[in-house]
Protein backbone atom coordinates (compact mmCIF):
# COMPACT_ATOMS: atom_id res chain seq x y z
CA UNK A 1 0.00 0.00 0.00
CA UNK A 2 2.83 2.42 0.84
CA UNK A 3 4.27 2.00 -2.67
CA UNK A 4 0.89 2.92 -4.20
CA UNK A 5 0.63 5.99 -1.98
CA UNK A 6 4.19 6.97 -2.85
CA UNK A 7 3.46 6.60 -6.56
CA UNK A 8 0.34 8.68 -6.13
CA UNK A 9 2.36 11.44 -4.49
CA UNK A 10 4.80 11.36 -7.38
CA UNK A 11 2.03 11.42 -9.97
CA UNK A 12 0.31 14.36 -8.30
CA UNK A 13 3.59 16.24 -8.01
CA UNK A 14 4.38 15.61 -11.67
CA UNK A 15 0.97 16.87 -12.78
CA UNK A 16 1.57 20.10 -10.89
CA UNK A 17 5.02 20.40 -12.40
CA UNK A 18 3.91 19.77 -15.97
CA UNK A 19 1.22 22.40 -15.49
CA UNK A 20 3.94 24.88 -14.63
CA UNK A 21 3.06 25.27 -10.98
CA UNK A 22 5.73 26.63 -8.67
CA UNK A 23 7.03 24.84 -5.60
CA UNK A 24 6.90 25.62 -1.92
CA UNK A 25 8.92 24.81 1.18
CA UNK A 26 6.17 22.80 2.85
CA UNK A 27 6.17 19.11 3.86
CA UNK A 28 3.16 16.80 3.46
CA UNK A 29 2.66 13.57 5.43
CA UNK A 30 0.46 10.66 4.44
CA UNK A 31 -2.57 10.38 6.71
CA UNK A 32 -2.35 6.57 6.91
CA UNK A 33 -1.76 4.65 10.11
CA UNK A 34 1.74 3.42 9.27
CA UNK A 35 4.29 5.02 11.57
CA UNK A 36 6.76 4.97 8.69
CA UNK A 37 4.48 7.34 6.77
CA UNK A 38 5.29 8.84 3.40
CA UNK A 39 6.66 12.34 3.63
CA UNK A 40 6.89 14.65 0.61
CA UNK A 41 9.39 17.48 0.89
CA UNK A 42 9.34 20.07 -1.85
CA UNK A 43 12.74 21.56 -2.53
CA UNK A 44 13.28 25.23 -1.83
CA UNK A 45 12.75 27.63 -4.73
CA UNK A 46 12.86 25.17 -7.63
CA UNK A 47 13.64 27.44 -10.58
CA UNK A 48 11.28 27.87 -13.51
CA UNK A 49 13.73 26.21 -15.89
CA UNK A 50 12.93 22.77 -14.46
CA UNK A 51 9.19 23.29 -14.70
CA UNK A 52 9.42 21.80 -17.62
CA UNK A 53 10.95 22.14 -21.08
CA UNK A 54 9.82 18.69 -22.32
CA UNK A 55 6.28 18.53 -20.91
CA UNK A 56 4.67 17.90 -24.30
CA UNK A 57 6.73 14.73 -24.82
CA UNK A 58 4.78 12.97 -22.06
CA UNK A 59 7.68 10.64 -21.28
CA UNK A 60 8.62 9.69 -17.73
CA UNK A 61 11.72 7.71 -16.79
CA UNK A 62 11.50 5.63 -13.60
CA UNK A 63 14.99 4.64 -12.41
CA UNK A 64 15.37 2.31 -9.42
CA UNK A 65 17.67 -0.37 -8.00
CA UNK A 66 17.26 -3.93 -9.31
CA UNK A 67 13.73 -5.27 -9.40
CA UNK A 68 15.06 -8.58 -8.07
CA UNK A 69 14.04 -6.91 -4.82
CA UNK A 70 10.20 -7.01 -4.90
CA UNK A 71 9.97 -3.58 -3.30
CA UNK A 72 11.62 -1.85 -6.26
CA UNK A 73 9.54 -3.91 -8.68
CA UNK A 74 6.43 -2.62 -6.96
CA UNK A 75 7.70 0.96 -7.14
CA UNK A 76 8.24 0.62 -10.90
CA UNK A 77 4.86 -1.03 -11.46
CA UNK A 78 3.02 1.59 -9.42
CA UNK A 79 4.82 4.45 -11.14
CA UNK A 80 4.02 2.99 -14.57
CA UNK A 81 0.36 2.43 -13.71
CA UNK A 82 -0.13 5.91 -12.27
CA UNK A 83 1.78 7.62 -15.08
CA UNK A 84 -0.18 5.83 -17.80
CA UNK A 85 -3.46 6.80 -16.12
CA UNK A 86 -2.37 10.40 -16.65
CA UNK A 87 -1.47 9.85 -20.29
CA UNK A 88 2.31 9.47 -19.96
CA UNK A 89 4.60 6.82 -21.42
CA UNK A 90 6.70 5.45 -18.56
CA UNK A 91 10.06 3.75 -19.15
CA UNK A 92 11.22 1.70 -16.14
CA UNK A 93 14.92 0.85 -15.87
CA UNK A 94 17.31 -0.25 -13.10
CA UNK A 95 20.71 1.11 -12.06
CA UNK A 96 21.54 -1.92 -9.87
CA UNK A 97 22.99 0.41 -7.20
CA UNK A 98 25.74 1.38 -9.64
CA UNK A 99 26.19 5.16 -9.74
CA UNK A 100 27.95 5.01 -13.13
CA UNK A 101 25.10 3.03 -14.68
CA UNK A 102 22.63 5.43 -13.09
CA UNK A 103 24.45 8.38 -14.67
CA UNK A 104 24.24 6.68 -18.07
CA UNK A 105 20.50 6.11 -17.61
CA UNK A 106 20.06 9.80 -16.78
CA UNK A 107 21.99 10.62 -19.98
CA UNK A 108 19.59 8.43 -21.96
CA UNK A 109 16.55 10.04 -20.35
CA UNK A 110 17.94 13.49 -21.16
CA UNK A 111 18.73 12.56 -24.78
CA UNK A 112 15.21 11.19 -25.26
CA UNK A 113 13.68 14.41 -23.95
CA UNK A 114 12.05 12.98 -20.83
CA UNK A 115 9.35 15.14 -19.30
CA UNK A 116 10.42 14.03 -15.82
CA UNK A 117 12.61 11.51 -14.03
CA UNK A 118 11.49 9.51 -10.99
CA UNK A 119 14.48 7.99 -9.21
CA UNK A 120 15.24 5.77 -6.23
CA UNK A 121 18.90 6.64 -6.27
CA UNK A 122 22.22 4.79 -6.14
CA UNK A 123 23.72 6.82 -3.31
CA UNK A 124 23.03 10.09 -1.53
CA UNK A 125 26.31 11.67 -2.67
CA UNK A 126 27.08 9.60 -5.78
CA UNK A 127 23.78 10.59 -7.41
CA UNK A 128 24.19 14.35 -7.21
CA UNK A 129 26.07 14.63 -10.51
CA UNK A 130 23.38 12.73 -12.45
CA UNK A 131 20.58 14.83 -11.00
CA UNK A 132 22.58 17.98 -11.74
CA UNK A 133 22.68 16.97 -15.42
CA UNK A 134 18.91 16.60 -15.53
CA UNK A 135 18.50 19.92 -13.73
CA UNK A 136 20.79 21.65 -16.24
CA UNK A 137 18.78 20.09 -19.09
CA UNK A 138 15.54 21.48 -17.67
CA UNK A 139 14.16 18.09 -16.65
CA UNK A 140 12.58 17.85 -13.18
CA UNK A 141 13.68 14.95 -10.98
CA UNK A 142 11.48 13.44 -8.29
CA UNK A 143 13.48 11.42 -5.76
CA UNK A 144 11.62 8.62 -3.98
CA UNK A 145 12.55 6.43 -1.01
CA UNK A 146 16.11 7.81 -0.75
CA UNK A 147 17.26 11.42 -0.67
CA UNK A 148 20.35 12.98 -2.21
CA UNK A 149 22.59 15.18 -0.09
CA UNK A 150 22.01 18.41 -1.99
CA UNK A 151 18.96 20.63 -1.85
CA UNK A 152 17.51 22.56 -4.76
CA UNK A 153 18.16 20.04 -7.55
CA UNK A 154 15.07 17.88 -7.11
CA UNK A 155 11.55 19.21 -7.40
CA UNK A 156 10.58 16.83 -4.59
CA UNK A 157 12.23 14.20 -2.42
CA UNK A 158 9.47 11.85 -1.30
CA UNK A 159 10.64 9.54 1.45
CA UNK A 160 9.44 7.44 4.37
CA UNK A 161 10.07 8.58 7.92
CA UNK A 162 12.83 6.04 8.51
CA UNK A 163 13.76 7.43 11.91
CA UNK A 164 10.23 7.01 13.23
CA UNK A 165 9.80 3.56 11.71
CA UNK A 166 13.08 2.21 13.12
CA UNK A 167 12.34 3.64 16.54
CA UNK A 168 8.94 1.92 16.54
CA UNK A 169 10.56 -1.40 15.57
CA UNK A 170 13.12 -1.07 18.35
CA UNK A 171 10.44 -0.27 20.90
CA UNK A 172 8.49 -3.36 19.81
CA UNK A 173 11.64 -5.49 20.24
CA UNK A 174 12.21 -4.11 23.72
CA UNK A 175 8.61 -4.85 24.67
CA UNK A 176 8.86 -8.42 23.34
CA UNK A 177 12.14 -9.19 25.13
CA UNK A 178 11.71 -7.18 28.28
CA UNK A 179 14.76 -5.17 27.28
CA UNK A 180 17.16 -8.04 27.95
CA UNK A 181 19.22 -10.45 25.82
CA UNK A 182 21.52 -10.50 22.80
CA UNK A 183 20.61 -9.42 19.28
CA UNK A 184 22.15 -9.20 15.80
CA UNK A 185 21.59 -6.25 13.48
CA UNK A 186 21.24 -6.70 9.71
CA UNK A 187 21.94 -3.44 7.90
CA UNK A 188 20.83 -2.40 4.45
CA UNK A 189 23.21 -0.85 1.93
CA UNK A 190 25.67 0.94 4.22
CA UNK A 191 26.27 3.81 1.78
CA UNK A 192 22.54 4.53 1.80
CA UNK A 193 21.25 7.37 3.96
CA UNK A 194 18.17 5.34 4.95
CA UNK A 195 20.37 2.59 6.35
CA UNK A 196 22.24 5.04 8.56
CA UNK A 197 19.08 6.77 9.77
CA UNK A 198 17.38 3.49 10.66
CA UNK A 199 20.39 2.10 12.51
CA UNK A 200 20.85 5.31 14.50
CA UNK A 201 17.20 5.36 15.55
CA UNK A 202 17.30 1.66 16.42
CA UNK A 203 20.31 2.14 18.69
CA UNK A 204 18.85 5.26 20.26
CA UNK A 205 16.28 2.95 21.84
CA UNK A 206 18.21 -0.28 22.37
CA UNK A 207 21.31 1.37 23.84
CA UNK A 208 19.16 2.48 26.77
CA UNK A 209 18.34 -1.13 27.69
CA UNK A 210 20.25 -4.17 28.95
CA UNK A 211 20.27 -5.68 25.45
CA UNK A 212 23.62 -6.38 23.79
CA UNK A 213 24.43 -6.35 20.08
CA UNK A 214 26.59 -9.42 19.38
CA UNK A 215 26.78 -9.11 15.58
CA UNK A 216 26.23 -6.53 12.86
CA UNK A 217 26.34 -7.28 9.13
CA UNK A 218 25.21 -5.64 5.90
CA UNK A 219 22.55 -7.47 3.89
CA UNK A 220 22.70 -4.86 1.08
CA UNK A 221 18.87 -4.79 0.97
CA UNK A 222 18.81 -8.38 -0.39
Region locations from a protein language model:
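A residue-level marker of the well-folded mature domains of exported/periplasmic proteins
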Residues: 2-4, 8, 14, 18-222
Amino acid sequence: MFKKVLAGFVAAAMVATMAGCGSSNSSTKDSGSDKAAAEATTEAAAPAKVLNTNAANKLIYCITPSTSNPYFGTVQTACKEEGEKLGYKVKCVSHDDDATKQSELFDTAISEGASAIVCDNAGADASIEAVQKAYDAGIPTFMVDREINKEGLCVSQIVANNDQGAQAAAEALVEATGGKGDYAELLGLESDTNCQVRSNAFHRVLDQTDMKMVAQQSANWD
